[in-house]
C-alpha cells in the first residue's frame, strides 16, 4: 500500500499497475506528457488574456459597489470561476505554473501551507500538478486555478470592489491567428 503516484508495479506482458488516489489502474505504460516551458504572463484586468502555451483563456471583470446576485453567483459558480476582493491585490495579476517552495494560505485555512502539500491533500495526481495554472500578485498566490483561492483575497463585508475570474480551456483550432 504505497502513496498515490508511486512507481508502478510491473505485470506480465508489459502491463503496469498504478494506484491513483482510490483507483487501481492497470494499463500499458504511456509516455509522460512533456513538461510545459512557460514562465509567466501578466493578466489584462479587466479584459481577456489568451495563453497559448497553456491552452487557456482568462476573462477578468471588475465590479464596484453592491454586487446584485452575489450570493447566487457564488453558490452556482463552478471550478472555472472565482471571485475575489480586488482591493486586496498587491500589484498586477500574473498566471504561471508552480515553483519549488511555493506556499499559500488556502481559503478557510488558518495558516500557510506548501503548495505541494495542498496538492497531495487534495489528491491532485502528480502528473497534473505541474500543469495547474497559478494566479499570483506581487506578494502571494491568489488562486490555484480550479481548486482554491487564497484566504487573504476572500470577500468580506468590507469588500467594495470585486474581481470576477473565469478560465476556459481553448483548443488550438479556437486560438485566433496573429494579425
List each model region and its residues.
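AMP-forming adenylation/ATP pyrophosphatase catalytic core
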Residues: 1-179
Amino acid at each position: 500500500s504505497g502513496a498515490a503516484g508511486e512507481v508502478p508495479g510491473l505485470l506480465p506482458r508489459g502491463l503496469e499497475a498504478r494506484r491513483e488516489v482510490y483507483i487501481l489502474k492497470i494499463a500499458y505504460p504511456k509516455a509522460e506528457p512533456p513538461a510545459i516551458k512557460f514562465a509567466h504572463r501578466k493578466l489584462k484586468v479587466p479584459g481577456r488574456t489568451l495563453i497559448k502555451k497553456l491552452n487557456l483563456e482568462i476573462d477578468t471583470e471588475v465590479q464596484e459597489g453592491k454586487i446584485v446576485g452575489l450570493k447566487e453567483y457564488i453558490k452556482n459558480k463552478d471550478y472555472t470561476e472565482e471571485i475575489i476582493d480586488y482591493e486586496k491585490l498587491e500589484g498586477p495579476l500574473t498566471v504561471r505554473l508552480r515553483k519549488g517552495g511555493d506556499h499559500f494560505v488556502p481559503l478557510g485555512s488558518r495558516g500557510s501551507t506548501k503548495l505541494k502539500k495542498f496538492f497531495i491533500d487534495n489528491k491532485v495526481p502528480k502528473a497534473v500538478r505541474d500543469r495547474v495554472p497559478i494566479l499570483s500578485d506581487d506578494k502571494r498566490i491568489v488562486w490555484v486555478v480550479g481548486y482554491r483561492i487564497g484566504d487573504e483575497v476572500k470577500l468580506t463585508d468590507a469588500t467594495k470592489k470585486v474581481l470576477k475570474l473565469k478560465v476556459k480551456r481553448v483548443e488550438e483550432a479556437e486560438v485566433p491567428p496573429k494579425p
